[in-house]
Amino acid sequence: QVFRAPLSPPRSSRAEGRHVDDHLLRTGIEAWSGCEIVVVEGAGGLFSPLGKTTLGADLARDLGLPLVIVDAARLGGIGRTLCAVRAARAEGLCVAACVFSQVSPATTHPAGEEALVQDTAADLAVLVPDVPVTILWHGARSFDPPIDWWRAAMLGISD
């Protein structure tokens, strides 16, 4: 299902005189069952509404897939990401990795933006030592440090 308005799916669907099909939401992944790896992208966080009574966490639980938590590499990233990790675990979800994404080019910062982002990732890694933490720099095609995504996915599924 695709809705035009940049609103939550329930609000956007209502604005179009439609509704979110909860069955399709949960079974749409079946079309990809022959693939080795499937990435299901969520938006808005674990507690964003996807349907009238369905939250992102509900869908993640129903699909049984490990989570990759992504946040912008900026002030507050540790708190937001740690909150998401703890919320996911409280919901019985497995977190396979955390990614800090540099969403725009580096700006001039007295302490050096690169060092701040690296320190942020290192500080989070201390707080969640069992979860790989990485950075995706603006314009980069690989993660820093590299992540073995296959291993992360398998560890998440086996938990």
Model-derived segments and spans:
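Short, surface-exposed linear patches
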Residues: 18-20, 60-63, 90-92, 156-158
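Short coil/turn connectors at secondary-structure junctions
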Residues: 33-36, 63-66, 93-95, 129-131
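C-terminal lobe/tail of nucleotide-utilizing enzymes
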Residues: 86-159
